[in-house]
UniProtKB/Swiss-Prot annotation:
Organism encoding this protein: Schizosaccharomyces pombe (strain 972 / ATCC 24843)
Compositional bias ranges of the Low complexity kind: 276-291
Cross-referenced Pfam families: NTF2, RRM_1
Domain NTF2: 18-134
Protein name: Putative G3BP-like protein
Amino acid sequence: MTAENATLLEPVLGKDEIGWMFVQEYYTYLNKEPNRLHCFYTKKSTLIHGDEGESISLCHGQQEIHNKILDLDFQNCKVLISNVDSLASSNGGIVIQVLGEMSNKGKLSRKFAQTFFLAEQPNGYFVLNDIFRFLREDVEEEEESPDAVEKEKKDVASEPYVNGVQSQEHLPSAKEEGHYQDPAATENNFATAALISNETDSLNQATLAVPEEPVIQVTEASVPSFVSQQENQLQDEALTSNSKNADAIGASDANVATAPKSWADLIARNHPDVKSQASVSSTASTTGQTVKGVNADQTQQPTAPYTQSNELLETSVFVKNIPPETSDVSLKSAMSIFGPVKAIEFARRKGTAYVDFVNHECVQLALNKKTLQINNATLNIEERRRLFSGKFNKSGDKKSNDNYNGMKRNFRKGNRGAFDGRSKEVTTSKKQNN
């Protein structure tokens, strides 16, 4: 096979793949050989390096860029890349934008944005333009005012409840339109809390009258609601046949005390779209079965918002900038100053970990502290962000499910100082064909 035919068979790498290879090679030199980082530039290159909003001077030429890199004093600089975008530009050039976090000399990591323009040269590419900026991290989240929270508490506390269900005086007749929840759906705590809150809001907006027909009050275990007029013929028959039992139940409502506002009720107000689903046949059977066991169940069944609210609170935090020589035992011991530690998931290669405490109070103490000193290094403690479902992924997965969203891809090592835009597989293919 001639050299011309071999050249035609060589695959041409895309601009995005060349960009990936460059980014991997550039930050590898930044970590291991920062004194040779100027080899990526030429006398035509320009560089800007500073903080967001800072007025800085332009570095022109390879020598000025080299002096600037020496002034930055990179030592054991670690970079966590979260995003890389590459686009083809004019004259065969490539524009690359990098987002991530950088930690130098073991200090706290800072978010940054860096943009490269790779220009073509006979043997590959070189960095013609380089813009680097550290980003500010002073964005404040809006919090709900204490007055609004206190007002919501008073509104909910004024509603009469019996084991999480409104008393007979505040219940509409069985023929009013509403929603019904299947008893099997009580396993979903959010759905239960949202259902109670939605019914409360709708009742406050409507003018209610004492129903002429007996109204059957039931416990949280069966979670009743109201069926539309077109679907409740079977329920009307059950209500009529059990009127005596309902009268006895209604007499006991005089002694009902108001229930305090719960955390789950607050959550329910923020989820107005949560609705229950059930069939008409299950409505009839639930109503008939609930009448007989109301008095006994009222003293035995606790309300769902009280029994399940603590399970919804976060009990773990995300810790980064952990020195690789730190052991699991020493990390657990250091984090124990905030409270008992249940488990630790330590990604030693990334220098990050998830620390799971026994309760939410320990998490609050850790987040308020924000930093922790260990092995002459400052650990950064952040809130665990659950962007995807599932547990902490092992290293090597394509995506992470929580605080990780870095690029995890294998790169092929390029030439020092320039990139030829070709993979090693091309050389192997040529040898086999020859």
